[in-house]
Amino acid sequence: MEKFEKFLEREGLLHILAEHRKRNFPEQGFKETYVRCAKSLVQVKGESALKDHFSGMPLELVASFNPYQLENKDGELQLIWRGSGIGDILVRVFHKQQKTETEYFTNKQGKVTINLDVPGDYLVNAVHMTEGAFNRGELWTSYWASMTFQIP
């Protein structure tokens, strides 16, 4: 349970721990499954207009900016859960070269503005958890949205 608790704390999901205990779920020997929802924003040579869009993944980060033509040093993302913005979710931004991690939370519409003032490679991620498939013995399912891009 200690490993599960640390994971929940790191991902901003302590409410899941409270729910786990409230339901008297077992402390050990339970299953948690996960779903990865990953995308990369890549500029194709000769293309100048990169536009991200919702592709239909269960949990998805959608950028309203083109990282290759960033006009200011901030970029807005929306975290979408099953077609609608989801609020109060931890979004972490990792910068590869600087070896930094910055944390943000989505607003009620699932939107968050992140700082992108340093050129380099970025990874943005967010995690959302739901009840698992009890008929398969899974107590929880975590959905991992991630996006990578480069700021030139």
Please provide the spans of the model-predicted regions.
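Hydrophobic beta-strand segments
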Residues: 89-93
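Short, conserved, GDST-rich strand-edge loop motifs in beta-rich repeat architectures
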Residues: 133-135
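Blade-edge beta-strand/turn elements of extracellular beta-propeller
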Residues: 100-105
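Glycine-centered loop-to-beta-strand initiation motif
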Residues: 106-116, 120
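Short, aromatic- and glycine-rich surface loops/edge beta-strands on solvent-exposed regions
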Residues: 1, 121-131
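A mature extracytoplasmic/lumenal domain signature
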Residues: 95-97, 118, 128
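Beta-strand-rich domain onsets/edges
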Residues: 7-75, 80-87, 97-99, 138-152
